Amino acid sequence: MTVVAIVGRPNVGKSTLFNRISKDNSALVDDLPGVTRDRNYARVSWNDKPFVIIDTAGFVGQDTSAFEELTREQILLALDEADILLFVADAKTGLHPGDAELADLLRRSSKPVFYAVNKIDGSEQRRHAAEFFELGLDRIYPISAAHGFGISELMDDLCAAIPEAPAQTAEEEESGGAIRVSILGRPNVGKSTLVNHLLGAPRVIVSPVPGTTRDAVDSHIVKAGQEYVLIDTAGIRRKGRTREKLEKISIIKALQSVERSHVVVLLLDAVEGVTDQDLHIAGYIKERSRACIVGINKWDAADKDPKRTKRFMDDLHDRFRFLTYAPVLTFSALTGRNVARLLPTVKEVFRQYNQRVTTGIVNRALEETLARHEPPQAGNRRRLKFYYATQTAVRPPTFVLFCNYPQAIHFSYERYLTNRFREAFGLDKTPIRLIFRPRQRTGGTS
């Protein structure tokens, strides 16, 4: 699929254009220069031409900042990946030396380049784009990413440069079997380092400074014939410690990434131990009924002390009692030690998360479960009776059990039923739901 990269100086409106083209708000947009620090990807279609669009961080030519050096490297990687380049400049600030440097860089790429001058809000303002012809350009597209002016003309011409290929819808791509994996955790726990190790390339900026990753960034990878979409998310802090508006937005986007995911890898720090914030994140994953793997990073810095590792594991098992189905893996994202176990575990967890059980097998398991431990009394009324059960959904596996007094089922007996169903159907690594309903009667009132 053709890849289009949006490039330009900071705060010229690249993310706004990205959102306009992709018709969503998947990239952070804020008035602060340098908001988008990693590349962000979206699969879109325009004029029935499917393509991938990349939103890159702002290009800064001369800057000694370590972050800017990392960002420049990311932009160069994006240029390597792209088939078509979309240059964006800012009409309000005018022609800038950084525009000239970037335009020279793009010309050397030998790839098709479309030059857009943003923040032109109508035909009467087209004259503000004229000075950019000093860059030696043959064609300039005056646009307003915020208001939509000129976007259709730009995108029609850009899509005409995309080679004809069999159209593939988003639904078809999704049905191709890709497992969507969010990597979630507190700031600086090693999420980006883990993603980069899995990819084998510096796809995400890595820095010891907490908060380096602000956006949730998608990366595609194929291992052993299985496609994965890795979502590296911004670190989540407690709300009280999140002071910048931008960081608050990133937290929301990280939690939204959970909604998009099949499996969530909750990354903990072996050195810092289990924190209240880890517990908070785990609770959110549980609440959303997502499949989960608990990954303990930096284990090589902790496993030299057996007493310390035992305390860590004891604390983990005690505080994560509600997440007992989640496999626990220990590794070092930095060195790669034991990281190879992660994706096979993701694949197995996802298999269970999607597992279906026939109604006959479900009811045989229910009969055996009831025979082993009869239902308790339903308060002062008759004994609780179960009539039949069926699976109604996957992601997670969901079972509806029909009985006479669904509201009277004690949580301890529900836990017993849940554990027996896990054992009977091989669902030890996925959340499952049990829903209790009164038996439906036909031919009269219930």
Curated annotation (Swiss-Prot):
Residues 355-440 form the KH-like domain. GTP 2 binds at residues 185-192, 232-236, 297-300. This is GTPase Der. Pfam families: KH_dom-like (PF14714), MMR_HSR1 (PF01926). Keywords: GTP-binding, Nucleotide-binding, Repeat, Ribosome biogenesis. CDD domains: EngA1 (cd01894), EngA2 (cd01895). Associates with the 50S ribosomal subunit. GTP 1 binds at residues 8-15, 55-59, 118-121. The gene is der. SUPFAM superfamilies: P-loop containing nucleoside triphosphate hydrolases (SSF52540).
